[in-house]
């Protein structure tokens, strides 16, 4: 029931007594929405992974069952073809029985009319092989002689069997299925060290450091600029009038000002005028007074440290050049020193004289080396002359060669004993490190080490990328793959095989079969092959099932009267079997199978050998000579050293007077009554020979460090 409303809407009253307002007529039917069921989100999130896993398992199981059923069909077809082949051990009785059956079942009636074309049969067998592949490389070993196949198996059938993964014996009596792949072989040797990887990413920023110590209080700043003008002050008090008030209307008019200016008194100041315009910014103020001194800050200078350990002794300075030779002393007299009365021994040298003046100090070392002793003078040894005056400082000479050790000290020579060996000096400073030597040659590869422990299995690898298909979508061989094989794979294979030919290589056992590759895309249907030869007639099979009813036969020969049809005639005899049809085109290849699960990772390889110790690197270049250090303080005088080797001979002295030959002189005399030269007490030719000097020094009565030069006895 409806009733109009004042607003133009229609009030709809339902059969159940409910009323509603609608702006249309007839009112639209309201659909009753089903009640909402609350859904638990946690339940949904927990159930979705399980449902997806169940669907995935179902899909995998269905795919496996499909593959198994497809293989079973193919095997059944192969079994049928094998059964159709003639058997060599067939008996003649079976042939007779088959012949009788054919005669019995043959129809003697005339052939009926040809029947209609039957339905399309099932897809045929696999087509002929495709295009021949690229020529393979020759094997590095001798090929085994090929066993001729039996006549029982056709070449095409055997090829198909091999394509399906079956093997057959050479005599054709046994068919073997390919077994399951064996376990993975042992891991190969460890490969070479790879190239260094890419540099890693920049590391994260380190933690924030601790806050530093607060700084000291700064100096007081300069005085700031002058501030803006202040607000106007409050209104002042009213002033006090001291004279008569003259208002604005007090005078008679403006003429009074001109007539008598002296009698008019100024009035009080008026009210403040309006504020004037803002003034300009003032100048900067003067610098303020200096602030009070700040507090003392924390001292950054720590306490005085402890006394350090004493430093090492300085390196001894270089040896200085020899000093200048002094002037020759005065001739000595016999009255100064006692004479030697013995005629069997040579005269001994006199006591040492007083020390001479210090030598000239050079920049490198103030103490000069001791000069070599001069040759003996006259027999009469005079006293030491007075020291000469100090000469002027000469120019610095070039450093000479290292001299031989000097003679022993005077004190030890007088006592006749050997000099004491002084204590060893302090160790010298460590030398500067030399420059870095050149990089040594790479060491030889070490022997193979012991096998390490078996490692834990690695993680599952990532799924590989899809490879390049051998067959292009148009049914031909992929051109990119051809180019890849010719340009990259073929040169590598030829090089490896050429290397193998040059060596006595024994082929190893065949490796385990690799994983099954991806199925290529579906190729186009090949051309129809030529019709095959008729096969051998097989044995009679079992009775088949009852076939479908045949087609209606032709009308009988009876007359038809009126519109009535005659009785139905008996069914006609079956016609003879038709000729075998042509071989159908090859069926399309099946769908590619799903990728198999990756196999378990192989065991960890053996531990590689330890490398041998590398060769010693080449010696680096000798470092540059250091600069001479500053001259250290003069050390204490050391003990007298051992007598050294004789120094170089000094300059030749003045020739002495000829002595009187001895009474026991073995030398012959010359025409002048004197001994021949180079005889008796005169020096020998081997004076400068070291061996000769040592020999003369070993004679009794010889002076240490001097040659065994005999002198004639001194007589009165």
Curated annotation (Swiss-Prot):
The keyword Lipid biosynthesis does not apply. Residues 179-238, 265-298, 302-330, 385-411, 422-467, 507-557, 566-603, 605-664 are annotated as: Triple-helical region. InterPro entries: Collagen (IPR008160), Collagen_superfamily (IPR050149). Glycans are attached at residue 474. Residues 85-122, 183-472, 503-716 are annotated as: Disordered. GO terms for cellular component: collagen trimer; collagen type IV trimer; extracellular matrix; extracellular space; neuromuscular junction; plasma membrane. Residues 280-290, 389-401, 429-444 have a biased composition (Basic and acidic residues). Residues 266-277, 349-358, 568-577 have a biased composition (Pro residues). GO terms for biological process: axon guidance. Residues 402-422 have a biased composition (Low complexity). One of its GO terms (molecular function) is extracellular matrix structural constituent conferring tensile strength. Keywords: Collagen, Cuticle, Disulfide bond, Glycoprotein, Repeat, Signal. Pfam families: Collagen (PF01391). Nematode cuticles are composed largely of collagen-like proteins. The cuticle functions both as an exoskeleton and as a barrier to protect the worm from its environment. Collagen polypeptide chains are complexed within the cuticle by disulfide bonds and other types of covalent cross-links. Belongs to the cuticular collagen family. This is Putative cuticle collagen 99.
